[in-house]
Amino acid sequence: MTNQPYYETMYILRPTIPEDEVDSHLKKYTEILESAGGEVLDSQMRGKRRLAYPIGKHKEGIYVQLSHQGDGQHIAVLEKAMRLTEDVIRYLTVKQDGPLPAKRVVKTSEKNVKEDKEVENKETTTEDKDQKGDLKETKKSENKDSVTEAEGQKDIKEAKEIENKEIEKKED
């Protein structure tokens, strides 16, 4: 199956479904794909999120993403199963280009996402001495975005230095 294209299917479940039923839906669609000749490469529960626009009477939905590989015939079987259940309020399958995703199964609940955000935006308080020897309190933010931005600036600076060196070599 390595020469076959791979696909990503994102589907949205009703927000009122209990978490154990969400797991059973994921297992059900994985079995349907495999029985139709496809291979599941990755599955991710994205959790409950607000919809961009209401679908039916729902303003929220539980997002699930499936990455799968096959000859394309398995997609019709999967989408037919999704169309026939009332729990799936929307689905979309897209053919992907590029390298295959790593094969894994990740389940993320809403509680874990909130805990991760709290850890990412954690502030620490440290005591530093100023020049006079007096203690002063400083706060250091450990926001991942600021670290990523700083690393990005460093990468840009390094790239410019390399580019300048290459220009100097060409001039010599």
From Swiss-Prot:
Belongs to the bacterial ribosomal protein bS6 family. This is Small ribosomal subunit protein bS6. Keywords: Ribonucleoprotein, Ribosomal protein, RNA-binding, rRNA-binding. Binds together with bS18 to 16S ribosomal RNA. The keyword Ribosomal protein applies. It comes from Prochlorococcus marinus (strain MIT 9211). GO terms for molecular function: small ribosomal subunit rRNA binding; structural constituent of ribosome. Residues 100-172 are annotated as: Disordered. Coiled coil: none annotated. One of its GO terms (biological process) is translation. Residues 107-172 have a biased composition (Basic and acidic residues). InterPro entries: Ribosomal_bS6, Ribosomal_bS6_sf, Ribosomal_S6_plastid/chlpt, Transl_elong_EF1B/ribsomal_bS6. One of its GO terms (cellular component) is ribonucleoprotein complex.
